Regions:
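Phosphate-group recognition and catalysis centered on beta-loop-alpha active-site segments
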Residues: 1-118
């Protein structure tokens, strides 16, 4: 049976961040579910919503920002710890987690998904 950490351990750490994914694995997940979107300059990043408003200190659509701009975003969560993390690229995610014997569920978001090349 696959136990997915949905956006990581998003009840305890900011969703779709390294801290959330590692915590999900520490809590016993053997799979990670995440969302991939493209930035304005074509970088694939992990983020669920179309806009940054709900979970970050930035406003507006993710696709309107470049990766250099998004690197500065602070990602908060539904957790009340006051802790924040940052947006990561899909490449960084793969480099960190492909070494583990786990499953992945990747949802491609946005209007440009047919143009995504891995």
């Amino acid at each position: 049976m696959i136990n997915y950490a949905h956006r990581g351990a998003s009840d305890y750490a900011p969703e779709n961040t390294l801290s959330s994914f590692y915590l999900g694995l520490l809590q016993g997940a053997n799979g990670i579910e995440t969302d991939v979107q493209k930035t304005k300059d074509g970088v694939l990043v992990l983020f669920h919503d179309d806009t940054l408003d709900r979970v970050s200190n930035m406003q507006g659509k993710l696709c309107d920002y470049t990766w250099d701009e998004l690197k500065e975003a602070e990602i908060y969560g539904s957790c009340t710890t006051g802790f924040y993390d940052r947006i990561i690229t899909f490449r960084e995610f793969l480099e960190k987690f492909c070494r583990y014997d786990i499953h992945f569920a990747i949802e491609l978001k946005g209007t440009d998904v047919e143009k995504v090349k891995l």
